[in-house]
Amino acid sequence: MIVQNVITHLEELSPLTYAEEYDNVGLLVGNRKAQVTGVLVTLDTTEDVIEEALKNKCNLIVSFHPIIFKGLKKLTGHNYVERIVIKAIKNDIAIYAIHTALDNVINGVNDAICRRMELRNKHILIPQKGTLKKLITYVPKSNLVKVRNELFRVGAGRLEHYNKCSFNIDGKGTFEGNETSNPTIGSQGAFYENAEVQLSLIFEKHLEKIILHTLFATHPYEKVAYEILSVDNHNHNIGMGMIGELPEAMEELRFLKVLKQKMNTSFIKHSKTFNRKIK
């Protein structure tokens, strides 16, 4: 296994395209083609973490927070960030940060906290816009089910709690191939009219490459007619934060105590209490 194999798996779970614009996520240090000897997972990449990685023969660190947040202009070892980067490079240790890419996916950090707190009716607090696209294509009637099912299989047509969503309009497609064409139906230089279906499906933007690859692989025509449109709707599967309801209402101080227990921590910071129940 190489570093890129691990990255591919991580980015299937948490695509970097959904990270906040200010963030610095992805592979920060190291070679994507290096063989992985071990993976160390951490909240922050510190000097002690580098030492632990060396001790345990881990040459890939997967960190939640990025050690490099702003551009480095020098590598002199003047501060801890520079020292960590220098030591990682010297010892061929790759560093990968996931941060808000994992914050913003439906099954990410916030969902894990909600599950630990046993929250019900949970949903994204601040849904992102600009994360959805629409594919419109035109398929011969006889091939519609095959093409549509393959697009469903790779993730097209998912809308929150619903899968396999599409819109289908019957119509007629026309074309006339020139002398360099190789039409699947009809012949060169002949005008042809065929019963087709306009197929429309929504998909999340990180899936565009696999969606188009699947369309081209399953559509019978030599030249596939299609359009990709950006959709500005809120995506309630992508966004920052998550909100839900506790199994039962409880006083604020009791909630804080339960929170400490559930999160297995002895210390938390909180805002001023108002002697109200939390649900």
Please annotate each region the language model reported.
Residues 1-279:
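Hydrophobic structural segments
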